[in-house]
């Protein structure tokens, strides 16, 4: 699963997830899966979608993951009273704004890429759309 090798601080404030995304264009591959909604993706969700895509294209072509879970989410254990400090880091998330390209793919036909991204999108909690590279 994806997570940072090391961080300056172990825990983070909750913060807000506002604005529009940087990285809104298909940069590496020919096809992309772009977020339409706003939310957060856990490392497990990112990995599940990657596996679904890889299996769909039968390990041909190339896949790029354009998001990285760099925000720690803490949880307190069950049946523990409030107070006594912030909980332990349980998982890592990537904050997603509308317009962010999540995955890219190249080296496969468009129909196969569409099918693979459809399977991947089913694993994700946010609305997504299929995009192709625009040649200027």
Swiss-Prot record:
One GO CC term on file: cytosolic large ribosomal subunit
InterPro entries cross-referenced by the UniProt entry: Ribosomal_uL16 (IPR047873), Ribosomal_uL16_bact-type (IPR000114), Ribosomal_uL16_CS (IPR020798), Ribosomal_uL16_dom (IPR016180), Ribosomal_uL16_sf (IPR036920)
Transmembrane segments: none
Annotated GO biological process: translation
GO molecular function: rRNA binding; structural constituent of ribosome; tRNA binding
Gene3D superfamilies linked: Ribosomal protein L10e/L16 (3.90.1170.10)
Domain of life where this protein originates: Bacteria
Keywords carried by this UniProt record: Ribonucleoprotein, Ribosomal protein, RNA-binding, rRNA-binding, tRNA-binding
Cysteines paired by S-S bonds: none
Cross-referenced NCBIfam families: rplP_bact
Subunit structure: Part of the 50S ribosomal subunit.
Protein family membership: Belongs to the universal ribosomal protein uL16 family.
Function: Binds 23S rRNA and is also seen to make contacts with the A and possibly P site tRNAs.
PANTHER family: 50S/60S RIBOSOMAL PROTEIN L16 (PTHR12220), LARGE RIBOSOMAL SUBUNIT PROTEIN UL16M (PTHR12220:SF13)
Name of the molecule in the record: Large ribosomal subunit protein uL16
